[in-house]
Design a protein with these regions (language model features):
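Envelope-exposed proteins and targeting segments
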Residues: 65-74, 79, 106-108, 149, ...
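Periplasmic OmpA-like peptidoglycan-binding domain that tethers envelope proteins to the cell wall
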Residues: 115-185
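Residue-level preference for alpha-helix termini and adjacent loops
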Residues: 1, 14, 75, 82, ...
Length: 185
């Protein structure tokens, strides 16, 4: 028979689990980020099939074909796009990988995609995801010397959930780095 104490403990554990899981998300190593973003392209578009950056951002079919890596370890305060100094070691790892890629291939271009979970309105999640992507780009450029011309940003809000739930989910609150120079004119 369940007691109040047992039920309370179970409820507290259930509430704490997403936070514990988020805390356990680790930033991929710079080598892993490089390997993912420098892998052989999944598809090679002919020059006449290439698109504008704007069209690439709107076409999930093309985005799925691009080399990418999800970064779930950058933590933002609820409803905020500000990046705390405590997150800089994670961003430095990303910056190291991007700088090395750009040294080897000056034409490399990376899209920073911001994503949210489904909590909140569609409009607020859309705006927040855009702000977070811009915030990460700004930090990469200003604090870590990644060339800004190689980075584009976009926010998708709750449009592309990894975990299909309307509840809070740390896995859905992420940034995706997507290499897109193979797709644009």
């Amino acid at each position: 028979m369940l007691t109040r104490r047992t039920l309370a403990a179970a409820l507290i554990a259930a509430i704490a689990m997403p936070s514990l899981a988020a805390a356990q998300a680790t930033t991929p190593s710079a080598a892993t980020i490089e390997r993912k973003l420098e892998a052989a392209p999944r598809v090679k578009l002919r020059p006449n099939e290439r698109v504008t950056i704007r069209e690439f951002k709107r076409r999930p079919d093309l985005r799925r074909m691009a080399r990418s890596i999800d970064i779930q370890s950058i933590n933002f305060a609820f409803g905020s796009a500000a990046i705390a100094n405590s997150q800089y070691d994670k961003i430095e790892t990303i910056a190291d990988a991007l700088r090395r890629i750009l040294r080897r291939d000056r034409g490399a271009r990376v899209l920073i995609e911001g994503h949210t979970d489904a909590v909140g309105s569609f409009q607020s999640n859309q705006a927040l995801s855009e702000q977070r992507a811009v915030s990460l780009k700004r930090t990469l450029v200003r604090e870590f010397g990644v060339p800004g011309h190689a980075l584009e940003t976009v926010g998708y809000g709750e449009e592309f959930l990894l975990v299909q739930t309307q509840n809070e989910n740390w896995q859905n609150r992420r940034v995706t780095l997507r290499r897109f120079d193979d797709f644009i004119r």
